[in-house]
Amino acid sequence: MSMQRSDSGSVHSSALLPEEFRANDFLLSHLDIACTIHSNLWDEPLLAINSGGLFSTASRSRCYCTNLRGHKPITSYASCVSVKPVQEFLGWPSDRPWPAWASTAWFDNCLRAIVGLSCASPRSVTQIKQYIKANPGTRLHKPSEKDVLKKIRVYNLVPSRTGTTPDVLSVEKVEELMGFSRGHTGSCDQYHTTDHQRRKMLGDSFQVDTVAYLLTPILDLQRAGKLPPEGITVLSLFDGIGGALVALHKIGVRLNRVITCEKDELRRMVVRNWMQKHAPRAIHIEMVDIRDASKGPSSTAFIRNIMNKGPIHLVIGGSPCQNISMLNRVSSDKGSGRSGFSGDDSHLFFSYVTILRKCKEEHERRGRRGGTG
């Protein structure tokens, strides 16, 4: 199976044994973008899911395209996931009144999950704190308060435990929102991460519990003996901080070999640390640049080399999508602007597609030969 995801939020996934495919795109901004993804990923239909209220206290809308079959009804599965209301998630004392401004800001009981863009400047936070302190009963309904309300939501400002003025949601709480364990992106012996780096990494990642739901058929196949009970082989492209691997681990899918591709060294170390703790027996191979494995004859050699040691059961990843994101305000004339799949980063989607097709071709070739693939 393979899947792809990106910073602006695209995910595409497809399983090779058996044939299973899934894709997610973040807030499809243009129909032509949706059609490009759809046509390159075997014309599978798109499925829209908002994680908020179903899998997380965070609102995170995505569209998915999958050929995985056999999911439980989403409401039935989600009913088994404990999603806390905002006040409970924050640990707000039940005997203290909830601030009026917070009732307006978080009226839908869902915090924001675009945390990569929500690193508020100290000056902005101070200004908002001063305004709320001077207007303690405000519900932020006045036209003049529209900018304050917007910043509170964008920056994920929540009532502080020691008072009613806003404070920035802690990184540990953001990790929980995104479905990771506390400290997943934290520093360890091998590396040090700053608050800003952790927020950026989390903002670029999957909402783990949502992806876990979409991957549940993999567990069913493993339990039924259709996938190796000792563990599957996963090729994770644009791996980030390992959201897909964490999702598989959460639902109980065992891992045997994991090949990850991620250009950022800090994110690779986060995944390395997680693998050592949670999948110490799995073979972990790291790649840096997907282009090294997706161009010319070397791409076929790369896939064959992996499959010589056993079939690839899941290909999963997330190419950068800032060039197709509605949040991108840079001119389309610039490589970093909203220029579609011709942009500096989003064109890597096609590298993902190339590798996925090579995997399928090699699997089919080995099947015709009666091989192990």
Show the residue positions of the predicted features:
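Conserved active-site and SAM-binding loop architecture
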Residues: 1-373
